[in-house]
Amino acid sequence: MVSICDRVRYVETDMMGVVHHSNYFRWFEMGRVAWLRAAGVELWELMNANIIFPITHVEANYKESALYDDEIEICAEMTAFSRAKMDFTYRIVRKKDGALLAEGCSRNVFTDN
């Protein structure tokens, strides 16, 4: 598992300071890219080799709201890998109290240009 930390920005929230749900998918992507980078995989190298892996499925289960200025931990783990696909799971946790804010998963499939 790879984890990175970030802080909720004002632009990611609504008028009440609650994070808009779409931001969790961006955070999942940040975790996935960090996981790949830690494994020695750079996305631009794959793209230069005409290897692409679009997301064909993504889901999120929201547990508790993230709020403006919360420090969060984004955790990503690869759970399956084959020549055809790779699956990841994610957890978003508020650092100050350890509250699970969201969890999710995604699937990428491999193809070429």
Per-region residue spans from a language model:
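HotDog/MaoC-like acyl-thioester-processing domains
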Residues: 2-4, 37, 67-68, 78-113
